[in-house]
Amino acid sequence: MTPREKCGARDVALDALMQVDKANAWSDEALRRLIAQNRLDSRDAAFATRLCYGVMQNRMLLDYYIGCWCAQKPERLEPVIRGILRIGGYQILFMDKVPHRAAVNEAVEMTRRRGRPKAAGMVNAVLRRFVEHWMNMPDLPKGSTADYLSLRYSHPKWLVLRLLDLVGPDETQAFLRLDNDTVPTCIQVNPLRTTAEAVSYTHLT
C-alpha cells in the first residue's frame, strides 16, 4: 500500500494502532487525522473507531489468545502482523454484526495489501482458530486474582492491585468490565446555532 492510496476502515484502525504502539501517539488524535486523510464517511469512521478502541481495551487478552495458536509469541511478531491479528480477533470475539468469514478474509487481504503475502497463511490459520473456538476460548492461566483480572480485562496489574485493595474483587471486576464497555456516541447541541428539536428532525428525515 502506497502512502497516497486511500485506506478503508480496517486499514485506518491498523495505522492508528501502529502509531500508538510505535510513537506513543494519542489514539484519538491519530484516528482523527487518519479518518480525515482517508475521507471516511461517518459509518466507516465509526467502524474504524470501534476497532481501534476495542483492540486497545482488550489488547492483553487478544495477545494471549493469539499466542495460544501462533508459533511465535505475539511480542515477537512483526508489528503490522500483530495488529492485523488483533483487529481480526477483536471482530470475531466482540463484534456480533461482523460475519466471522468477513473478519478472516479481510485480515488476509490486509496482510497482502501490506506487502506480507507470505504471512497471509499464518494469519488465516490463527484467525480460523478464533472462529472455531469463539464460544469456548482457552482458559486463562490460573494465578492470583490480580493476574486473572489484569489479563481478562487488559488493565495494568498495578491498577488492578490498587482497586482490589480499595474496593475488593467484586467491585473491581465490575469497574473493569464497565471500563471496557463500548462508549455510546453522544451529540452536544450548540444552543447559539440550533436547537435539539432541529437536530433531531434533521437526522430523522
Residues of each region from the PLM?
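Class I Rossmann-like S-adenosyl-L-methionine
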Residues: M1-L204
